[in-house]
């Protein structure tokens, strides 16, 4: 289990994470600079991939204490400290030998959300021979205007457990007029598969689960559809999708210049940042498809999802300011319009 404290301005959040880490030796806690959801998730991927070298800062093991580690060398996300419970080590020699565990599968969970108690047990046996298990989610919405949220799986009307291919997924998307897709906490992923396609989350944007989900599914061999609700999605005031009510001190650093450009209007900042994020996502999808050697899937992918991405990007013309120079970099869009 990996917990990531992404530079929370609420110190109590880190303290709570430390309490859980102390109690459960399975947990590894990363405390890092605020970099957003993508960077937090990428820390987990990179840790389990063996991309970090850990050096113990704590020299002696004391009961009821946390063992602290530093990252040596490559530390792109500015991880301050890595914490582990004393229970995970038998002696001081173990501290110097601590490294990442080998995992078969990875599953993501945001701090607001939670799983049904049997989620992992339900997923693992269904991972046999597939790259992804895609399950359903129930919304627990605390904001009135998002009360109509429902999970992407429901859009596809899959009523029974089945195994599909990317061809089926894309053809169903087109047939059912599903123009947008996202995936991150809605299932379990084979970790060898994830590493083999070298897919990570785009840093410093929102809607990163759209890019991640689309590229994850289109490259899969088989996807297990499990239309059972194993996840509870909570939407609260400071969720990324509802940045309108975020406090000034909680604004991520990669958004701050936009916030200033729009005279500290959080609504305009959020709307512009959404356009910018879709712009980056489309660019990265185009780059991927230009290298992906499957003409049929490439064509289906564009037909299914490019229209909505382009429509959302064209909202840029609703703004009289353009701090990220989106309008100057839109020539690539017109070939797909």
Regions found by a protein language model. Give the residues of each.
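C-terminal subregions of glycosyltransferases and related glycan-biosynthesis enzymes
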Residues: 234-337
């Amino acid at each position: 289990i990996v917990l990531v404290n992404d530079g929370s301005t609420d110190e109590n959040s880190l303290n709570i994470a430390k309490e859980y880490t102390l109690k459960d030796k399975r947990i590894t806690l990363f405390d890092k600079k605020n970099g957003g959801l993508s960077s937090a998730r990428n820390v987990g991927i990179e840790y389990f991939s063996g991309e970090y070298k850990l050096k113990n800062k704590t020299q002696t093991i004391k009961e009821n204490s946390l063992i602290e580690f530093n990252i040596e060398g490559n530390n792109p996300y500015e991880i301050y400290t890595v914490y582990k419970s004393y229970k995970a080590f038998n002696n001081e020699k173990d501290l110097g030998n601590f490294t990442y565990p080998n995992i078969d599968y990875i599953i993501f969970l945001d701090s607001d959300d939670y799983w049904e108690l049997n989620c992992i047990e339900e997923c693992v046996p269904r991972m046999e021979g597939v790259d992804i298990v895609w399950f359903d989610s129930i919304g627990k919405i605390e904001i009135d205007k998002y009360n109509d949220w429902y999970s992407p799986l429901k859009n596809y009307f899959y009523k029974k457990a089945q195994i599909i291919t990317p061809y089926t997924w894309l053809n169903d998307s087109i047939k059912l007029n599903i123009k947008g897709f996202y995936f991150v906490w809605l299932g379990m992923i084979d970790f060898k598969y994830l590493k083999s396609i070298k897919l990570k989350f785009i840093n410093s944007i929102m809607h990163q689960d759209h890019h991640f989900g689309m590229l994850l599914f289109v490259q899969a061999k088989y996807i297990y559809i499990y239309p059972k609700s194993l996840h509870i999605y909570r939407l609260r005031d400071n969720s990324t999708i509802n940045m309108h009510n975020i406090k000034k001190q909680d604004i991520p650093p990669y958004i701050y210049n936009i916030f200033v450009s729009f005279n500290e209007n959080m609504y305009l900042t959020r709307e512009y940042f959404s356009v910018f994020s879709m712009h980056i996502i489309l660019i990265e999808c185009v780059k991927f498809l230009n290298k992906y050697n499957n003409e049929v899937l490439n064509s289906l992918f564009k037909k299914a999802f490019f229209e909505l991405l382009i429509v959302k990007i064209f909202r840029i013309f609703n703004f009289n300011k353009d701090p990220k120079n989106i309008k100057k970099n839109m020539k690539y869009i017109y070939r797909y319009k």
